[in-house]
Amino acid sequence: MTAIAIRPEALRDAVAAALGDKVRDIVLALDELTVTVSAADYLAAMQLLRDAPGCRFEQLMDLCGIDYSTYGDVGTEGPRYAVVSHLLSVSLNQRVRVKVFCPDDDFPVVASVSGIWNSANWYEREAFDLYGIVFDGHDDLRRILTDYGFIGHPFRKDFPLSGHVEMRYDTEARRVVYEPVTIEPREITPRIIREEKYGGLH
């Protein structure tokens, strides 16, 4: 039988007590708890969140990368890349979001949590593929969505919208070939319709 969820404030206190000085920031907003930890404490904090009696987050439901470079003022002041995980305690009926920033923007690295939760395996590969975030200790960190010869990481904010290369099937060579992108860069601006009685408004 699943336990009745505790109040969000009680969960915040339980998580803060379990993590102690590993907590850099803890925010309770809209009844959702977000905990930020440093990259140095990330692996130990995640282990505590799984094993501490008041937490018992047995399941990692999601893990993704974030590029904060164009996110308001954050990109100009703080670290560029972060990893966000969503954890679930089935036995205690509670959830928490964990955020960790990569300390080096040029080579973003955080510890892998795939040894704690098997479900992190493909999530970390996806974050590596799309953002270039390296997960130290991952057994098989290789691309999962893009082609093996893909150049760059397509979810980074500085990745060109048209990409670097395109692939097509060459009927003469009877194989897939890679070529430089032939799409011309252009500004895409929505057309604004300005009519006096547009949409029935008078």
Curated annotation (Swiss-Prot):
<dbReference type="GO" id="GO:0050136">
    <property type="term" value="F:NADH:ubiquinone reductase (non-electrogenic) activity"/>
</dbReference>
<comment type="similarity">
    <text>Belongs to the complex I 30 kDa subunit family.</text>
</comment>
<keyword id="KW-0997">Cell inner membrane</keyword>
<keyword id="KW-0874">Quinone</keyword>
<dbReference type="GO" id="GO:0005886">
    <property type="term" value="C:plasma membrane"/>
</dbReference>
<dbReference type="InterPro" id="IPR010218">
    <property type="entry name" value="NADH_DH_suC"/>
</dbReference>
<keyword id="KW-1278">Translocase</keyword>
<protein>
    <recommendedName>
        <fullName>NADH-quinone oxidoreductase subunit C</fullName>
        <ecNumber>7.1.1.-</ecNumber>
    </recommendedName>
</protein>
<keyword id="KW-0830">Ubiquinone</keyword>
<keyword id="KW-0520">NAD</keyword>
<dbReference type="Pfam" id="PF00329">
    <property type="entry name" value="Complex1_30kDa"/>
</dbReference>
<comment type="function">
    <text>NDH-1 shuttles electrons from NADH, via FMN and iron-sulfur (Fe-S) centers, to quinones in the respiratory chain. The immediate electron acceptor for the enzyme in this species is believed to be ubiquinone. Couples the redox reaction to proton translocation (for every two electrons transferred, four hydrogen ions are translocated across the cytoplasmic membrane), and thus conserves the redox energy in a proton gradient.</text>
</comment>
<dbReference type="GO" id="GO:0008137">
    <property type="term" value="F:NADH dehydrogenase (ubiquinone) activity"/>
</dbReference>
<dbReference type="InterPro" id="IPR001268">
    <property type="entry name" value="NADH_UbQ_OxRdtase_30kDa_su"/>
</dbReference>
<keyword id="KW-0813">Transport</keyword>
<keyword id="KW-0472">Membrane</keyword>
<comment type="subunit">
    <text>NDH-1 is composed of 14 different subunits. Subunits NuoB, C, D, E, F, and G constitute the peripheral sector of the complex.</text>
</comment>
<dbReference type="InterPro" id="IPR020396">
    <property type="entry name" value="NADH_UbQ_OxRdtase_CS"/>
</dbReference>
<dbReference type="InterPro" id="IPR037232">
    <property type="entry name" value="NADH_quin_OxRdtase_su_C/D-like"/>
</dbReference>
<dbReference type="GO" id="GO:0048038">
    <property type="term" value="F:quinone binding"/>
</dbReference>
<keyword id="KW-1003">Cell membrane</keyword>
